[in-house]
Amino acid sequence: MMSLGLVGRKVGMTRIFTAEGDSIPVTVLDVSDNRVTQIKTVETDGYTAVQVAFGSRRASRVTKPLAGHLAKAGVEAGEILKEFRIDAAKAAELSNGAVVGADLFEVGQKVDVQGVSIGKGYAGTIKRYNFSSGRATHGNSRSHNVPGSIGMAQDPGRVFPGKRMTGHMGDVTVTVQNLEIARIDAERKLLLVKGAIPGAKGGKVFVTPAVKTKGAK
């Protein structure tokens, strides 16, 4: 599914109340300053997409090729460039320098949010994969928190790829699907999304219309 989305910054979590008095946990996303830097078409690039910039960056921190690319679009340099695949009809409605705001979505709409999870450092299998620990006593002397067997003997004589073992936990790209937009603050350019979103405060996230919801926009 090809849909235009937004780049945002995770502000943090809070709660809001409905008209019925129900408390809803929400994650606040700052989606300000999404500006179009390039419109890609089938004729020039082989596919249709829109490239947007988010945030700000000092001119001294921008490479000359990128500075020329942004100057051509008449857009200020940003922290990040993100490309969204869209259809030709939607691309025709946009132009370089156009601002894509929070009004791209509507309250109640389902969205997918992608971010980088918080890094936890080196972790064992109990913390990393929720393995069970061994017995504390009754003959168990040195195998309380070990993962157990990681393979067989001479045949096949190796550890299979993908075996869950100790290692770095977190700091991976995670996509949470079908989150609901609880509220939109168009004036402050904020999206309030129901539930938790991967990543630390200040982390960059990508918000797109849900792809697995019936009738998703």
Swiss-Prot record:
How is this chain modified after translation?
Answer: Methylated by PrmB.
Q: What InterPro entries does UniProt report for this protein, alphabetically? A: Ribosomal_uL3, Ribosomal_uL3_bac/org-type, Ribosomal_uL3_CS, Transl_B-barrel_sf
Output the Pfam families linked to this UniProt entry: Ribosomal_L3 (PF00297)
Q: Name one GO cellular component term.
A: cytosolic large ribosomal subunit
Q: Which PROSITE patterns match?
A: RIBOSOMAL_L3
> HAMAP family under this entry?
Ribosomal_uL3_B
**Quaternary data:** Part of the 50S ribosomal subunit. Forms a cluster with proteins L14 and L19.
Q: What is this protein called?
A: Large ribosomal subunit protein uL3
Q: Which gene encodes it?
A: rplC
